[in-house]
Amino acid sequence: MDSRGFDSEGREFSSATEMWAHEIGAAADAPVSAAVAEPAPAPAAGSNGVAGEEEAGGGGKREEWYSKAIAYWQGVEASTEGVLGGYGCVNDVDVKGSDAFLRPLLAERFGAARRHLVALDCGSGIGRVTKNFLLRHFNEVDLVEPVSHFLEAAQENLTECMEVGEDTHKAANFYCVPLQDFTPDEGRYDVIWIQWCIGQLPDDDFISFFNRAKIGLKPNGFFVLKENIARNGFVLDKEDNSITRSDAYFKELFKKCGLYIHSIKDQSDLPKELFAVKMYALVTEKPKIQKNGKRRRPKNSPRMIRS
């Protein structure tokens, strides 16, 4: 990765490769084994039965990278205002934007027939995204989050909003595991939702995470990545050890993950002082091209209903 960038202390880097060598002692493309709670929508610079323990993963400088991030989020209040960095006001706008992006994707990929849908909420924090959004669309949502007091808050928050009946909507499993160490169950998820957390992963762990996570998707399943976007290159936040990547940076990483962009949408109506936010729907199959050169959207096809 050759994008130029800088950190929050003003240090400039000629490339992402240089920055990662400095921060974790590894080249950006080095293959390794993939975040931390849903971090706040960051100001433009100069997540959501508990299993596992809080871990940093890796060794040496890489371990320090993750340990610092965990330590930062351990000091944050387990509330909407806390996980959104004092910008709790963006919650409703965020949920509205996510709903508008996801709803047509579900109809296109899975059809309108009655079905049992399962999602994974990555870097789930206190369960904000699951409670306010994902449970509207999915019968089951699993949450993965490395900060224990956030996940404990998520369990409490989600207990009160369970719908019990023939068509149950519930938070099913809570995993206290960092993304760099997490591997989903094979073929469990229709959608893997990753919001405001992937910036905690260095590029190599980003690629490794998505490569492992692919096995967790059902037929026609897809990823949604919703993340802050730098105008150019990258911005490294030294306070919580997170990186804000540009659109071009993300697209290069998607290629390295063997993922294809199905659709993209900007999140609107955020405060002007915040980074721009984009939503990417990512699929594992290459979009088919029609004779007129346009991508052909896949037709819905009958499939076995899986829980």
Curated annotation (Swiss-Prot):
Keyword S-adenosyl-L-methionine included in the entry's annotation: yes
UniProt xrefs under Gene3D superfamilies: Vaccinia Virus protein VP39 (3.40.50.150)
InterPro entries named in the record: MeTrfase_NTM1 (IPR008576), SAM-dependent_MTases_sf (IPR029063)
Protein keywords: Methyltransferase, S-adenosyl-L-methionine, Transferase
Example GO biological process: methylation
Stretches the record annotates as Disordered: 38-60
Residues the record lists as binding S-adenosyl-L-methionine: 123, 128, 145-147, 179-180, 195
Keyword Ligase (UniProt): no
Signal peptide: none
Catalytic reactions of this protein: N-terminal L-alanyl-L-prolyl-L-lysyl-[protein] + 3 S-adenosyl-L-methionine = N-terminal N,N,N-trimethyl-L-alanyl-L-prolyl-L-lysyl-[protein] + 3 S-adenosyl-L-homocysteine + 3 H(+); N-terminal L-seryl-L-prolyl-L-lysyl-[protein] + 3 S-adenosyl-L-methionine = N-terminal N,N,N-trimethyl-L-seryl-L-prolyl-L-lysyl-[protein] + 3 S-adenosyl-L-homocysteine + 3 H(+); N-terminal L-prolyl-L-prolyl-L-lysyl-[protein] + 2 S-adenosyl-L-methionine = N-terminal N,N-dimethyl-L-prolyl-L-prolyl-L-lysyl-[protein] + 2 S-adenosyl-L-homocysteine + 2 H(+)
GO CC aspect terms: cytoplasm
CDD domains: AdoMet_MTases
EC numbers: 2.1.1.244
Domain of life: Eukaryota
An annotated Gene Ontology molecular function: N-terminal protein N-methyltransferase activity
Described purpose of this protein according to its UniProt entry: Alpha-N-methyltransferase that methylates the N-terminus of target proteins containing the N-terminal motif [Ala/Pro/Ser]-Pro-Lys when the initiator Met is cleaved. Specifically catalyzes mono-, di- or tri-methylation of exposed alpha-amino group of Ala or Ser residue in the [Ala/Ser]-Pro-Lys motif and mono- or di-methylation of Pro in the Pro-Pro-Lys motif.
Family, per entry: Belongs to the methyltransferase superfamily. NTM1 family.
Protein name: Alpha N-terminal protein methyltransferase 1
Protein source organism: Oryza sativa subsp. japonica
